[in-house]
């Protein structure tokens, strides 16, 4: 994933 949270 590009981010540690849902982008």
Swiss-Prot record:
Localization of this protein: Secreted
PTM annotation (4-hydroxyproline): residues: 6
Keywords from the UniProt entry: Amidation, Disulfide bond, Hydroxylation, Ion channel impairing toxin, Secreted, Toxin
GO cellular component, one term: extracellular region
Tissue: Expressed by the venom duct.
Keyword Secreted: yes
Disulfide bonds: 3-7
KW Disulfide bond (keyword) present: yes
Any one Gene Ontology molecular-function term assigned to this protein's record: toxin activity
TM spans (from-to): none
Positions where Cysteine amide occurs in the chain: 7
Domain observations: The cysteine framework is C-C.
Function according to Swiss-Prot or TrEMBL: Its target is unknown, but this toxin may modulate voltage-activated calcium channels (Cav) or calcium-dependent potassium channels (KCa).
Protein family (similarity comment): Belongs to the O2 superfamily. Contryphan family.
Protein name: Contryphan Zo747/Zo763
Native source organism of the sequence: Conus zonatus (Zoned cone)
